[in-house]
Amino acid sequence: MNKILLQCDNLCKRYQEGSVQTDVLHNVSFSVSEGEMMAIVGSSGSGKSTLLHLLGGLDTPTSGDVIFNGQPMSKLSSAAKAELRNQKLGFIYQFHHLLPDFTALENVAMPLLIGKKKPAEINSRALEMLKAVGLDHRANHRPSELSGGERQRVAIARALVNNPRLVLADEPTGNLDARNADSIFQLLGELNRLQGTAFLVVTHDLQLAKRMSRQLEMRDGRLTAELSLMGAE
């Protein structure tokens, strides 16, 4: 059995505005193993995106904790969380969030620049990842010169350029047509096999979720069931 990479222990998240309290997450507990491909399925507003923000250290739970590689995030400073996000975690969103004035190569290189890698390593590694997603021939093109599917591939290359242990993906194909969505999920599976990267994908699409090795369902801020979707139509 693979080692547990990330563990959630009774995560709760509450927002308060004046006298109004809104509970978004209720005692969420689960784990992700090294190299695992997992989906969390739920409708819009079910708490999936809030959960990803907590897992990535972008927000703080009201109670409970996230443990990454045996280390509680609650014990980490802001600087240590930022380093964790840069070195050990990758993020993919529904919208690519590429910098419009930078080329594909420069966008992919950004996490390496932030991590203060050597210039020669930055260029070679960024180009290597563009090649891995089939876009090395588009390295010098800006986002406006790329198709929607190509832009998302660049975003995936950027998420994986630092060899993260885990990639958190929030509706990564939600802005793509069926053909490009299928291509992106095939790419994630290939990168998982080649690099051993674990993926946690949140989505409302059961057809996409079934491609993952494990699926959990979220409703109203609660994990309600472990689904069996393999081969579902």
From Swiss-Prot:
InterPro entries: AAA+_ATPase (IPR003593), ABC_transporter-like_ATP-bd (IPR003439), ABC_transporter-like_CS (IPR017871), ABC_transpr_LolD-like (IPR015854), LolD_lipo_ATP-bd (IPR011924), MacB-like_ATP-bd (IPR017911), P-loop_NTPase (IPR027417). It comes from the Bacteria. This is Lipoprotein-releasing system ATP-binding protein LolD. It is an enzyme of class 7 (translocase). It is a peripheral membrane protein. It comes from Shigella dysenteriae serotype 1 (strain Sd197). Part of the ABC transporter complex LolCDE involved in the translocation of mature outer membrane-directed lipoproteins, from the inner membrane to the periplasmic chaperone, LolA. Responsible for the formation of the LolA-lipoprotein complex in an ATP-dependent manner. The lineage of its organism: Bacteria, Pseudomonadati, Pseudomonadota, Gammaproteobacteria, Enterobacterales. The gene is lolD. Pfam families: ABC_tran. One of its GO terms (biological process) is protein localization to outer membrane. The complex is composed of two ATP-binding proteins (LolD) and two transmembrane proteins (LolC and LolE).
